[in-house]
Amino acid sequence: MNNNTTAPTYTLRGLQLIGWRDMQHALDYLFADGQLKQGTLVAINAEKMLTIEDNAEVRELINAAEFKYADGISVVRSVRKKYPQAQVSRVAGADLWEELMARAGKEGTPVFLVGGKPEVLAQTEAKLRNQWNVNIVGSQDGYFKPEQRQALFERIHASGAQIVTVAMGSPKQEIIMRDCRLVHPDALYMGVGGTYDVFTGHVKRAPKIWQTLGLEWLYRLLSQPSRIKRQLRLLRYLRWHYTGNL
């Protein structure tokens, strides 16, 4: 078996993470032997690690997801510290989503999009079709009422979607994915947060050099000073890291 179709797992504070070496490893793993895996993809960064610690419902949601991967550089560094031989790299959720969409377009995999503002969702659909000829079999913006959820799940099931991406922020998107899987289990689900906004140019992502240096968090802070409280909260994670409480 090709080594890229399997991946080791690592545990941080009780949370089991998949250790992908790079983006190609992630894609080969998810499309092992030409078959797209089924389950839920969840990106893990330091902020989400803190939320998991503090919120039992979120912890249960995240633990239930099959594919938890290191989206944040802090998490990658913690894995490498705890497991010095680990060959694990950051796989940014926004980049993984684009690669999945490109692969879906190439193979004709049916995709259902959930979340985002109506105009952003429409632009996302148009760009995906134009750029990669993605077979989008349905979509729903993020502005639906609780009583409309079941009808949405039935639509997703009827569409035959094999990839469902949900852009509603955490933990809303994890709740939606969990509940939708009860109706439509035969798909790969991915929570993508604000990815549609970035993809369509409504939100500017950090330049590549900032990402490479692991300073995307600093770029966002400089761009949005209001994030300072969120960033200060991460000092708790740094304490875990530097005291080895992982």
From Swiss-Prot:
Q: What is its EC number?
A: 2.4.1.180
Q: Does the keyword Transferase apply?
A: yes
Per the record, what are the reactions this protein catalyses?
UDP-N-acetyl-alpha-D-mannosaminouronate + N-acetyl-alpha-D-glucosaminyl-di-trans,octa-cis-undecaprenyl diphosphate = beta-D-ManNAcA-(1->4)-alpha-D-GlcNAc-di-trans,octa-cis-undecaprenyl diphosphate + UDP + H(+)
Gene Ontology molecular function, alphabetical: hexosyltransferase activity; lipopolysaccharide N-acetylmannosaminouronosyltransferase activity
Enzyme class, spelled out: transferase
- TM ranges are none
Instruction: Report whether Glycosyltransferase shows up as a keyword of the record.
Output: yes
Which key words are in the record? Glycosyltransferase, Transferase
Pfam families attached to this UniProt entry: Glyco_tran_WecG
Q: Which GO terms describe its biological process?
A: enterobacterial common antigen biosynthetic process
Part of which pathway? Bacterial outer membrane biogenesis; enterobacterial common antigen biosynthesis
Tell me where on the tree of life, at the top rank, the source sits: Bacteria
Q: Which family does it belong to?
A: Belongs to the glycosyltransferase 26 family.
| Function recorded in the entry | Catalyzes the synthesis of Und-PP-GlcNAc-ManNAcA (Lipid II), the second lipid-linked intermediate involved in enterobacterial common antigen (ECA) synthesis.
Q: PANTHER family of this UniProt entry?
A: PTHR34136, UDP-N-ACETYL-D-MANNOSAMINURONIC ACID TRANSFERASE (PTHR34136:SF1)
What is the name of the protein in this document? UDP-N-acetyl-D-mannosaminuronic acid transferase
Quote the gene name from the UniProt entry. Answer: wecG
